[in-house]
């Protein structure tokens, strides 16, 4: 999606990482999850975790902005749009745009939202994502929200302009935003949007927050 922030255009779709750069820890978490059935990859990007999800769950929905879904790019070594790639590689999988999220009639046992909030420079859109997660979860479903908040790579952002949870960085070609969302920040956002915290922890510079719709201690 494109965001206009103080006269600067930020294209969040450019933040998506390829399947060659997964978190091995998150891959293992998905594989060992006690959840099964139906899953949603909320902010699927370049299908970084698609193989892990389709191997684990009976049906998977991949969701991202219409701009991300419709552009031709290299997806797992294939030049295609995301819907084209999914149609030719995965059974029992479908694709929905963020803009059409309200048309989804299913609810999900598991929702993955990995490195999505950190790419959004707009609080109202972040709230829209979290509200969408709550709406699409089953009553006993769980969502895993992951954000990287510490890395030497981020040092360059700190010379940029402070904005929301992070910084806007400009070079000669484009502008980008990265939010540094630790456990506390993510939990606060989720609680503000009526999600319950099931668990949270940090590992190797990333925050992991598991949320649900029910009451949890």
Which residues are covered by each model-predicted region?
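Local beta-strand N-terminus motif with an aromatic residue
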Residues: 36, 108-109
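Class I (Rossmann-like) S-adenosyl-L-methionine-dependent methyltransferase catalytic domain
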Residues: 1-103, 142-217
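A conserved beta-strand element that flanks and buttresses the S-adenosyl-L-methionine
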Residues: 112-115
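A short glycine-rich, Lys/Arg-flanked "PGG" loop and its adjoining helix->strand segment in the class I
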Residues: 127-139
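Short, charge-rich binding segments
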Residues: 102-104, 134-135
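A short His-aromatic
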Residues: 118-122
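Residue-level detection of beta-strand scaffold positions
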Residues: 57, 109-110, 133
């Amino acid at each position: 999606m494109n965001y206009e922030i103080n006269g600067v255009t930020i294209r969040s779709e450019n933040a998506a990482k390829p399947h060659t750069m997964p978190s091995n820890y998150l891959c293992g978490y998905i594989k060992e999850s006690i959840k099964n059935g139906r899953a949603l990859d909320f902010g699927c990007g370049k299908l970084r975790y698609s193989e892990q999800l389709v191997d684990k769950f009976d049906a998977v929905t991949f969701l991202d902005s219409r701009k991300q879904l419709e552009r031709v790019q290299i997806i797992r070594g294939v030049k295609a749009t995301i819907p084209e790639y999914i149609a030719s590689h995965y059974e029992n999988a479908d694709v929905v745009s963020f803009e059409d999220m309200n048309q989804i009639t299913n609810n999900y046992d598991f929702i993955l939202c990995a490195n999505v909030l950190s790419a959004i420079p707009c609080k109202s859109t972040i709230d829209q994502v979290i509200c969408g997660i709550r709406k699409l979860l089953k009553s006993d479903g769980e969502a895993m929200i992951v954000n990287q908040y510490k890395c030497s790579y981020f040092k360059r952002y700190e010379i940029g302009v402070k904005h929301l949870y992070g910084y806007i960085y400009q070079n000669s070609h484009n502008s980008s935003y990265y939010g540094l969302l630790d456990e506390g920040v993510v939990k606060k956002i989720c609680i503000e949007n009526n999600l319950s915290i099931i668990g949270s922890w940090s590992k190797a510079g990333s925050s992991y927050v598991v949320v649900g719709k029910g009451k949890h201690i």
